[in-house]
Amino acid sequence: MQIRKVKISKVKDGYRASSEDFVAVEEPLQIFVNEKNLAIIMRTPGNDLELTLGFLYYEDYINSLRDVEEISMLSDNEIHVRLTNGKFVETRNFVINSSCGICGRGFLNAIELLKSDAKTSNEVIISLPEKLRSNQGVFNITGGLHAAALFTLSGELISIYEDVGRHNAVDKIIGSLIHKRRLPFTEGILQVSGRIGYEIVSKAIKAGIPIISGISAPTSKAIEIAEDAGATLVGFVRGNSFNVYTHPERIDL
């Protein structure tokens, strides 16, 4: 369940009245790897398999689906993974909240150079925010979720996920690619609904995605690693304009 109805007091023009509202659900997902408690992720329930695969990929526990012997939900908020690659799993038991994308080991140690000749167009970039918004079913009811979507270079929607954490939504995108055995994904565009921080860009780069676009601003670290990795970073996509912060040669005008 991703939506919950709650009772509220609604205030308007100095008057208060009892009412109801719909809010996005946020609950903990406990991840066990090789029977060890690895992490607790605060997330919007749904697509937990994809979220877990994306998280484990970013944290360097897996490189592909071949590294996963078994993955199963033991309850609504508990998932167990058994690895085939003999990776040592330290019992860390840390909590990743909905605003923290690099609370674990993450991608701080290395940035790989992207290998992609992908190109897209000005028209495609401009069209993505509306395509993202029109497919945000839970946000349209609650106004409380971030979203990430993967598009082809011609602007066709491949997948979209919503979550209270923008990094979770990206992990779900990447986890779905792992599940479909489609990594690295070097011919697509990642579109996100909010600002573009370090964690968003680093996750996309690790998955091979060459173009990252957002409706808001990127951070300085996001720009730095996109430049170093050869990724095209686009921000403030609004109306018929946008800013290209790195590698503009991938976008034809």
Curated annotation (Swiss-Prot):
The active site is at residue 100. GO terms for molecular function: sulfur carrier activity; sulfurtransferase activity. GO terms for cellular component: cytoplasm. It is found in: Cytoplasm. It comes from the Archaea. Its main location: cytoplasm. GO terms for biological process: Mo-molybdopterin cofactor biosynthetic process. InterPro entries: Cytidine_deaminase-like, FdhD. Keywords: Cytoplasm, Molybdenum cofactor biosynthesis. Signal peptide: none annotated. HAMAP family: FdhD. PANTHER family: FORMATE DEHYDROGENASE (PTHR30592), SULFUR CARRIER PROTEIN FDHD (PTHR30592:SF1). Belongs to the FdhD family. Required for formate dehydrogenase (FDH) activity. Acts as a sulfur carrier protein that transfers sulfur from IscS to the molybdenum cofactor prior to its insertion into FDH. This is Sulfur carrier protein FdhD. It comes from Sulfolobus acidocaldarius (strain ATCC 33909 / DSM 639 / JCM 8929 / NBRC 15157 / NCIMB 11770). The lineage of its organism: Archaea, Thermoproteota, Thermoprotei, Sulfolobales, Sulfolobaceae. The gene is fdhD.
